[in-house]
């Protein structure tokens, strides 16, 4: 099974669903609202702004949670405020909600009533746009604003890595970059991220209109070292829980040693270098922010549910649905011990970018 067929958040609205456990990304969405607001307003300073009848906005990797509704609200209010200021007629707004085909679009669409009830006097529409953002999604010159939050760090495939001499698994006992991983593991992850992010930018450039904007919020790190606790904590906890299941005979060790997550947590420098290398965009704004996890991840039970909501589909595909309850119970136990020793992660790091399509890359 390809990565794109098993990458989706837990569906529905049960206690382990993404809808009920997306508190951290909701917090990030709230903190980054000013960037989205400013990007939407900047569309009305370009050469084509007077002719807007319809504003096309895409949210890539929207999932099924309420975060996309925060983005929609921000764009609507920003557009309305700017049109009021300029005494212009407000355009209709068409939202394209994108994610992979396994996404729970039904739950997403049910939640749209929040937007419809809140903005009854605004002409706005929404439609699903299933597909991978690692390829083209929209026609040329069709999008005015593209937004993606906590999507771009997901890779199109698991990085290819080989061990020295080929005698043992290259990342034995781990599922992501760690202190014990050989340098080849980091190099493989970085190489795959570079390939995917460059492809992402190349696909978005022709889709955007002249002066079009793109806002990206990416799970990131502050340190140049990819093995710091801020980068690896989530995956270390999960790897330890899986290793425990192996020791109990519930999971085959080979399944652990052959599994690595298709996910990379970049630094701001790595992201900026790739934007500059690809060359289609001007960086209007870039920052690295920290969001406190108090009340979201620091409670062991909440932390385990959060982790389960966005990892269970791919973890169950590799290790089997029958061990999931015991596995995430062990995650909770590990978080309890880490809390006692004050070893748990207390804040999350995000890289925030606002990009503008360059004049020299107009389609």
Curated annotation (Swiss-Prot):
Per the record, what are the reactions this protein catalyses? 7-methylxanthine + S-adenosyl-L-methionine = theobromine + S-adenosyl-L-homocysteine + H(+)
Enumerate the InterPro entries for this protein.
MeTrfase_7, MeTrfase_capping, SAM-dependent_MTases_sf
Q: Does the keyword Transferase apply?
A: yes
Binding-site residues for S-adenosyl-L-homocysteine, renumbered to this chain: 18, 62, 67, 99-100, 132-133
Enumerate the residues binding theobromine.
25, 150, 153-154, 219, 310
| Entry keyword annotation includes Transmembrane helix | no
Q: How does activity depend on pH?
A: Optimum pH is 9.0-9.5.
In which pathway is this protein known to take part? Answer: Alkaloid biosynthesis
**For the site Involved in substrate discrimination, which positions are given?**
147, 219, 263, 321
Annotated signal peptide: none
Q: What class of enzyme is it?
A: transferase
Biological process, per Gene Ontology: methylation
Q: What is its EC number?
A: 2.1.1.159
Residues reported in the UniProt entry to bind Mg(2+): 171, 259-260
* Alphabetic keyword roster: Magnesium, Metal-binding, Methyltransferase, Transferase
What does the cofactor field's note say? Binds 1 Mg(2+) ion per subunit.
| Name used for this protein in its record | 7-methylxanthine methyltransferase 1
Specify the species.
Answer: Theobroma cacao
